[in-house]
Amino acid sequence: MVVCLTVSCAHNKTSLSIGPGVVSLSSPQDVIVEMTGETYDKLETILQQVSYVKLSAIPLLSRIKKIQIADERIYLWDLVVGIVCYDMSGELLFQLNARGQGPGEYTDINAFAVNASLHQLVIYDNMKQSLMFYSTEDGRFVKSEKFNKPTPAEIAYWGGYFFYHNRLHRNYQDDISLHYYLLASKDGITIGKRYFKHENNKEDYPFSPSGHNLYDNNSKLYYCRDFDNIVYQIHEDSVVPRFRINLPNPLPASMIEERPNEMSLLRSGYSLGITDIYEYGGLLFFRFVKDGYIWSCLYNVEESKQVYCAKRIKFLDSSLIDTIDGIYKDCFYSILTPEYLDYAFSENPLEDYPDLFKTYDVEGDNPVIAFYRAVVR
């Protein structure tokens, strides 16, 4: 989410068939952001809670890096326990945690994506410089393909293509064909298109303020580069600017060249790091960092007006929403972590919550996935 590459022995070789992808010159929709306060507590006028999925407590998750829901299955990448797959009732189906050098084993997970059409779960292992393919049915190892370069920070599969977010090129300085942020491949190995040439000032400053750059929006795939405010919609053969998010007091591009201290930058009065970009039902959700806080925003794209921009979002009474983490079918969804639920239970008595939560153990249970549908306006 370019010059062509083929795989030969241990080295990727450049083919002459790669070409630049088309970046549309159409004008994006402007999204004007204004801060509305500490808390927005009228969420029930915008979203309604639909259902909850309590994940099986074994294995116990601790550091969730990415979630993807596809074909009635929930895939979670946890930095400690690996990739875990659940059904839509929260029951464990399988766990990928085979670390090692043997067949079917990986040394580390650097990125992953689900190819639902081929029933494949794909892991990028930087140490092995390989793509590892597993079955989404039972986690069974299928194959390994050598993938020396690029070194993607993120993978998405959409519309029959693999899309790679390629942050840096320091490991292949001389191969300028790959000095691009977004690369596309039909088979996962051979790069077919490239978009957005690397900028030297960002190569020298590898800090990434955004949690992700590729966003699965159910029927659409969105992409936003680090330190950028343009959200692009990815198509099979082009990318189209969809939104221009105008943040208050945005970070000047010149500051990146100064390579400021990361924590000082996040605590500064500048706005940066647009992330978690999800649009459904005429509503666009996203987050960014300013003054050391993460701000959540909701924008009505049909009426071109902001709904809110606040540090916290909640329902008027008992609140069970932390942030928007994705879209599945006709719903937004949110990962309710034990830490968040512990806080929510301290704010409101347990009897205010659905029965599912009355026996919830914040010390020994896994997160709950909550689904929300846009209120018909």
State where each predicted segment sits.
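Blade/loop signatures of beta-propeller domains
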Residues: T14-Y52
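Blade-loop segments of beta-propeller domains
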Residues: L55-K65, E91-L118, D125-N126
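Short coil/turn segments at the loop-to-beta-strand junctions that recur within blades
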Residues: P59-L60, N97-E105, K146-A153, K197-K202, ...
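Repeated scaffold domains used in trafficking and secretory/extracellular systems
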Residues: S62-K66, T107-F112, P150-G159, D204-H212, ...
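Beta-strand-rich domains and repeat architectures in extracellular enzymes and scaffolds
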Residues: I32-E34, Q49-V81
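Conserved blade-ending motifs and adjacent loop-strand segments that build the rim/top face
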Residues: F243-L266, E302-K329
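Asp-box/WD-like beta-propeller blade repeats and closely related beta-sheet repeat scaffolds
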Residues: D108-I109, D125-Y172, S177, R194-N200
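Short beta-strand elements that form the blades of beta-propeller/WD-repeat-like
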Residues: S24, R73-D78, H119-D125, G160-Q173, ...
